[in-house]
């Protein structure tokens, strides 16, 4: 049986939602091995002067838990 752990991470970018998701994944990869999937749960934007100034992506990161 494989046990999978799920964490939530928020990534942000000034250039787009794809980059915000990639930033969240990169942040998780700094401390987690074996990430198997990413689920994008929510994308939000900050608007300044009539345009989008920042994108944020809330993602779920899935990875297996190794047996002890």
Model-identified regions with their sequence ranges:
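A cross-kingdom feature marking charged/low-complexity
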Residues: 39, 44-68
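Short, well-ordered alpha-helical segments
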Residues: 2-36
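Compositionally biased, disordered extreme N-termini, encompassing classical targeting presequences
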Residues: 1-2, 68
């Amino acid at each position: 049986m494989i046990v999978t752990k799920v964490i939530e991470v928020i990534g942000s970018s000034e250039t787009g939602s794809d980059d915000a998701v990639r930033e969240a994944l990169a942040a998780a990869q700094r401390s987690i091995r074996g990430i198997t999937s990413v689920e994008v749960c929510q994308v939000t934007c900050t608007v300044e002067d009539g345009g989008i100034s920042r994108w944020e992506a809330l993602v779920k990161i899935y990875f297996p838990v190794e047996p002890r």
